[in-house]
């Protein structure tokens, strides 16, 4: 029965054989350091082991002794090992194997140095190309004006400042270094100037793009005072344009100075001085109807009084109440007219006629203020000359018609007192 050797090789270790079959009679292991020539005998009658002829001296171990230990790690590559086994039939099997070197295969130092130099050279070439591209892009960005618009907030001076840092949209990480370039004078004119933040009250703020007021309106706002009941002799100035409407064409230069999107520089004469001139603060005044405030030209007895309930009472007569006398034939009837303001007496000629007519004054912003709602009934009986004289001197008889009592607007917490 032939034996089948099963080789199992491992790196950095000697080659070993495992024999499968019946129990061997003797094992003889021989290791030599030179070339080995073995000639096994094929005759079954030879009781001896296979004859081995070597050119060098090889130590031999008798059968039954344990095998030699493994070769050390410092074994030379030319070492060899011979294993001979004796079978029960007398056949001998000799195997020859060479032990590889136990040293690990490492490349030489020169090869390693050349590989490191090649890697470092490629890294150097890559960094040089990247730096070349970066310097080229920086030089291009420095020569070209920036294309992105930056918001410039104008100061109180005549020229807006120049923004030193312009936002760039380049994906390179070093683009912010090149963005710190001051743009040229041609690109400064293209930057738009936005409206400055003015501290106007809420009543003066308008959604129009021009925050500057025309000259006539600005002088009117400066000299603005709470509205009063005026007589015919006083004249109320009216603004040239309301605040909510766009300004007239005369102020087109001021409007272009506040918001210039075409890219033209500011006119030499226009400055932002109008943003510093603040109008007086808006003080809310009580909305008292003009009819409730009497004129200073009226007599003292003509002024009505304010009752405790808040309603206007008829004026107190200074003479004894009585029926109105019948007017004479030469006297003209008296027809008072109510037009929404306090009456002012004016004598017409020598006839002694009193006309209670007043034109409503304009509001502070060009809007007529609505007078108090009245429903007055005119006197049905005509007045005589004596009654007219009583009216002129201040002695008032009780009126024959219904008393006109408007509803004034009272502020909470203020005491009710009659007008002087």
Swiss-Prot record:
Superkingdom as given in the UniProt entry: Viruses
Region (Disordered): 1-77, 137-181, 195-219, 235-281, 327-370, 396-420
GO annotation (BP), single: transport of virus in host, cell to cell
Biased composition (Polar residues): 137-157, 253-263
UniProt entry tagged with the keyword Transport: yes
Keywords: Transport, Viral movement protein
Keyword Transport among UniProt keywords: yes
Bias (Low complexity): 1-18, 30-59, 158-181, 327-348
Biased segments, Pro residues type: 60-69
Protein task: Cell-to-cell movement.
Name of protein: Putative movement protein
Organism: Maize rayado fino virus (isolate Costa Rica/Guapiles)
């Amino acid at each position: 029965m032939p034996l089948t050797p099963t080789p199992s090789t491992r790196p950095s270790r000697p080659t070993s054989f495992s024999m499968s079959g019946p129990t061997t009679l003797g094992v003889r292991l021989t290791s030599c350091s030179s070339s080995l020539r073995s000639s096994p005998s094929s005759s079954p009658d030879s009781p001896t082991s296979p004859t081995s002829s070597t050119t060098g001296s090889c130590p031999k171990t008798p059968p039954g002794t344990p095998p030699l230990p493994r070769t050390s790690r410092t074994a030379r590559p030319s070492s060899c090992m011979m294993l001979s086994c004796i079978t029960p039939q007398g056949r001998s099997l000799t195997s020859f194997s060479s032990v590889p070197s136990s040293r690990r295969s490492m490349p030489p130092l020169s090869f390693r140095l050349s590989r490191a130099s090649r890697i470092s050279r490629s890294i150097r070439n890559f960094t040089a190309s990247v730096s070349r591209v970066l310097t080229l892009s920086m030089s291009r960005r420095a020569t070209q004006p920036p294309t992105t618009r930056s918001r410039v907030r104008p100061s109180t001076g005549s020229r807006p400042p120049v923004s030193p840092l312009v936002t760039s949209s380049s994906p390179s990480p070093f683009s912010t270094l090149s963005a710190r370039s001051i743009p040229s004078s041609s690109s400064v004119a293209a930057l738009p100037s936005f409206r400055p933040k003015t501290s106007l009250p809420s009543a003066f703020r308008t959604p129009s793009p021009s925050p500057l007021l025309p000259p006539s309106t600005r002088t009117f706002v400066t000299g603005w005072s709470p509205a009063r009941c005026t007589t015919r002799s006083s004249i109320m100035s009216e603004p040239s344009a309301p605040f909510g409407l766009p300004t007239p064409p005369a102020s087109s230069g001021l409007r272009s100075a506040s918001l210039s999107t075409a890219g033209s520089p500011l006119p030499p004469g226009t400055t932002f001085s109008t943003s510093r001139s603040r109008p007086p603060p808006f003080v809310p005044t009580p909305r008292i109807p003009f009819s409730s405030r009497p004129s200073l030209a009226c007599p003292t007895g003509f002024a009505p009084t304010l009752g405790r309930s808040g309603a206007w009472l008829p004026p107190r007569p200074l003479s004894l109440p009585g029926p109105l006398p019948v007017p004479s034939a030469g006297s003209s009837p008296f027809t008072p007219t109510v037009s929404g303001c306090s009456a002012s007496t004016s004598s017409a000629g020598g006839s002694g006629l009193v006309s209670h007519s007043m034109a409503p004054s304009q509001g502070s912003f060009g809007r007529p203020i609505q007078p108090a709602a009245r429903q007055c009934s005119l006197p049905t009986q005509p007045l005589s000359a004596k009654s007219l004289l009583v009216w002129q001197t201040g002695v008032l008889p009780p009126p024959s018609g219904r008393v006109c009592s408007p509803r004034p607007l009272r502020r909470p917490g203020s005491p009710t007192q009659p007008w002087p």
